[in-house]
Amino acid sequence: MKVLLSIILTLFVLAGVGPSFAQAEPPGFTNASRISTAGDSELPQVFASGDGIFAVWTQSSLGKSDVFFSKSTDGGYTFGSPVNLSESAKGQSLYPQFVEKDNHVYVTWQLSLSGVSTILMAKSLDGGTSFEKPIQLSDGSQLSAFPQIALSGNHVYSSWIEKSADNSTNIIFAKSDDQGNSFGVPLHMTHNVGNSGIPKLSSDGNQVYLAWEDNSRGDYEIFLSKSSDSGTSFHVPVDMSTTTGQSGTPEVIVSGNNVYAVWMDNTSGNYDIFFTKSTDGGDTFAKPVDISHLKGDSGYPQFTVWKNNIYVTWTQTISGTNYDIFFAKSSNNGDTFDKPINLSNNFGPSGWPKIASDGNIYVSWVDSTPGKFDVLITKSTDSGATFENPTNLSHSKTESYENEMAALDNTVYMVWQEGASGNHTIVFSKSTTFVPEFGPLASVALVLSIGSIIVVSYRSSLKLKI
């Protein structure tokens, strides 16, 4: 099992062949429609609320890249003209993240220019109709990358990775108490000689939670620190993983006084998916449990929480050339988990799952079984006991990947990128009746290595054996 001991600060993007666009309307979904404009558009994000459907992505042309934003006010049937938030004269604006609540939209990204990398943020207080000029959150003294953002009332929180002069990486936190008009001096959450990475930021009322992976003790562990005063001060970090193996790629969800976390861990010799929870606001955590227990490596988990149900999905190695999407659920707030089930279970490699729930459960992933990489999705209406046959959303002539998903009121909103290297577009589709495809997908030869999907986990130092 190879463990890379440095945080990877570059994203390896999948390469496709030829121009692309979705060709057939998938059952139960609208035709995939293009929401980006000219240029090479990648890394889409999507969010759905009662205020609208919001999307951001990066778009490259003429040697530079910018962050773009678009919004739909009619449930995703149409989108407004994309707005360039960064408007960089030069340099690369990358890795956008955003939040929206009550028509307040905050978008953050990384700007790389002349060997310097800084964190910027733009905000809109009118639902994305207009945006203020971006402000710089990092101090510019070190390389800063991979920002996160969270929102609670008038408080806006951000965290990112900073590379120090000794090549170690640390976690930085900054906050605003005035709706993002101004930010305080960035706070170093870690001061390690090793590497800290993959910050995950959450907030709930006055509580702020920040988790990350960290090898300052010699092996990678998952730490969490919380603030009870809106980010003014933080408690001593808690080691959530407490295992003897390497732990990485954390995901954290906060729901009231409950804090849930999943990650990948190789204590058993292979990577497995571990889960822990806190019922006292993150002060203490239960002993981590292995919820995968499968042969081969399990990695890159995603999960969601709906009432007392915990739903987890991940990429599972089946053989040296095949990967599938697995799912496990808990119906008792994470006290126990059912045996994992295989959602993709097909001939081609499947990877990079996303999951959402609005009572129903939706899992999407990238799959090469149709003959090239397409975006597939499945749904459960019985709390994960059974799933419908997967639906192919993209049906594109070239490659589709980097899928992101939002669910609201029994409707699923999907974005992804498709096309050739250097010529990608961002497309959108929403569910209508969600009638599944029936019958097995055709068995076809593998056209791209699943390793291309796996390396998209660019912020983690842990990698599955490929």
Which stretches of residues belong to each language-model region?
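Secretory targeting signatures
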Residues: 1-25, 173, 261, 275, ...
